[in-house]
Amino acid sequence: MTKLRKLTALLLAGALTLLLLTACSGGGGSSGPEAQAEAKVMRAINNDRANSRAAPLSNDPDMQRIAKKKLDQANLDADLNGSIGRYKFYHDVKYDKETSTLTLIAQYDYHNTKLEDLIGCITENNKASNLNFNHSSNWTKVGVAATIYNGKTYIAITLQVKTT
């Protein structure tokens, strides 16, 4: 009977140790501040798309890679020189025969940020271009990346639309 108790205790200790090691391994999805910001932006995008009865989009790996690259290459102290109201941003539009992309970088730490307002102001002068970035229901792919720089969170969003 004592051997059975010892064996049970040993098995329980081993199982708890294994559980602790797998829980702390970090092998799953990230939950750091960058990942949380990315998830919030994707939720906001998909909530807006739901209002237009458009299908939800996932954080596309190719678009996210472009967003991350733009975010890494940007001089966040100097490049965010456009401004709408109280927030500063940077944008870059790439035209292609079939699809075109818009990458937007902005500081994420302000509250009540309206992504549609930012995109609407940026694309206001591009009405002649047959591109319609300012309606989320027209987006075919989206990628979101975030970084923390000097204690502030910055996001880069790359949107893709089909040309019409």
Please place each PLM-identified region on the residue numbering.
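Bacterial N-terminal signal peptides that target proteins for export
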Residues: 1-11
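Bacterial signal peptide processing site
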Residues: 25-28
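C-terminal motif of bacterial Sec signal peptides marking the signal peptidase cleavage site
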Residues: 19-23
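Classic N-terminal secretory signal peptides
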Residues: 13-16
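A well-ordered secondary-structure block
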Residues: 88-164
